[in-house]
């Protein structure tokens, strides 16, 4: 039914062949957007829970965490990642005013160059997050050097940054989930579906 609706010109044979050879990305595209996707109430509850349990889960800050989010229905996931980042910043500001601990947070994902519907919101969100990061860590990254930015974020997550100024939590869509070694990272927060090899490699 999904492929008939999406591709009315496709033959039954072509649809059947597509179904029999579906990739993980195809399955993700078929998932209807969840009521949790880009739902600010959900985001606030998740962030609230992370702060509430942070001292215990991080062993009083000895360890840090990775947070991955992804939305279904063939929609861009980057706005959701930015929504989480903005909520962490909002809560950090409130907590700082109350004299409570805050969490050094960053978000990283690939810059969009596909001229798609979500390109502007993706790149604006990334640029905004980079400005917060630059202010926090004394860096000067922009959209012209996102690769260097991601490398710097990774060094602060795996605690190899030369200045010793490290991150508590990094929000990603797909980056850093595989092939990334961070001995002091003990928690993976997951607000998405993870399947097959990605599930195994992420954990």
Where are these regions (language model features)?
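Generic amphipathic alpha-helical segments used as scaffolds and interaction surfaces in large
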Residues: 30-41, 72-75, 140, 144
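Helical mechanochemical/support elements of P-loop NTPase systems and associated helical scaffolds
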Residues: 42-46, 80, 149, 195-198
């Amino acid at each position: 039914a999904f492929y008939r609706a999406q591709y009315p010109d496709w033959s039954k044979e072509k649809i059947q062949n597509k179904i029999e050879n579906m990739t993980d990305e195809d399955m993700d595209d078929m998932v209807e957007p969840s009521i949790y996707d880009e739902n600010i109430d959900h985001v606030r509850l998740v962030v609230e829970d992370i702060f509430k349990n942070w001292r215990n889960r991080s062993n009083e800050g000895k360890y840090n965490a990775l947070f991955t989010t992804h939305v279904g229905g063939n929609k861009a996931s980057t706005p959701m990642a930015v929504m989480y980042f903005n909520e962490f910043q909002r809560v950090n500001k409130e907590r700082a005013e109350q004299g409570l601990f805050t969490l050094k947070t960053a978000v990283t994902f690939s810059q969009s160059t596909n001229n798609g519907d979500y390109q502007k919101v993706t790149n604006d969100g990334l640029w905004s997050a980079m400005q917060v990061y630059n202010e926090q860590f004394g860096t000067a990254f922009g959209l012209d050097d996102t690769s260097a930015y991601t490398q710097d974020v990774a060094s602060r997550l795996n605690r190899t940054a030369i200045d010793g100024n490290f991150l508590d939590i990094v929000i990603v869509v797909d980056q850093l989930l595989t092939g990334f070694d961070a001995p002091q990272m003990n928690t993976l927060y997951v607000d998405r579906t993870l399947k097959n090899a990605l599930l195994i490699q992420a954990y």
